[in-house]
From Swiss-Prot:
GO molecular function, one term: translation initiation factor activity
Family to which this protein belongs: Belongs to the DENR family.
Signal peptide as annotated in the record: none
CDD domains in UniProt: DENR_C
GO terms, biological process: formation of translation preinitiation complex; translation reinitiation
Region: Disordered, residue numbers: 35-124
Protein name according to UniProt: Density-regulated protein homolog
Polar residues composition bias: residue spans: 45-56
Gene3D superfamilies: SUI1-like domain (3.30.780.10)
Ranges of biased composition (kind: Low complexity): 57-79
Domain SUI1: 131-204
Source superkingdom: Eukaryota
Ranges of compositional bias, category Basic and acidic residues: 81-119
Amino acid sequence: MSDTESSTPSQPIVVVEYCKICSLPTEYCEYGPSAKQCLKENGPHPNNNKNTASGKDSSNTTATTTTTDTTTTTTTSTENTEEKLKDLKIVDDSKEVSHVDAGKSESKEATGEEKEKEKVSKKKKEVKPQIIIEVNQRNKRKHVTKITGLELYGIKLSDAAKVMAKKFSCGCSVVKSISNPNSEDIDIQGDFGEELVDLIEEKYPTVPLSEIYFLEDKKKVKAR
């Protein structure tokens, strides 16, 4: 034996175990395609456990550091928020009327007024003009028949007075109304209440008989 051979130290033989499932060395099974099946078959490799433990320790240390930093940041931001809230004043707007609410209330009031106007206009439209016939006694034997409201149906009073004077052969004239100075009545000399209703029905068919009334003791009574 030479001096060179005697001076070289002998190295231990390394035995490599191969996995029966993935055909990789068992210490690399965890990186293979079937790591779970390899772990069941071979169990954990000693080298991998050490690496895993060290990895876990380092990850735990990093997580702890990160958590501490996060907690510190959160605490600082919370303190800043509390300081800002102290400077704020709480304002109660529940009792104040906003522009939108005011606009709504105004629109509701306007709508209510319009509805009232519509109701009044409808009532006015529904009210039909009435013709009132009143027979008054003058002296003991004389009577005067007064008719009011013919002009409301577009009848010219002067023409109607001529028709009545001719029909009843009596005096007939257009006079100012006592109850309403702005309107006029027709006065007929005599008692012609019922005959006057027949004349209106014959000569003026546009006038509904249901709107002709007799005025008796200051009360209106339908003529027909």
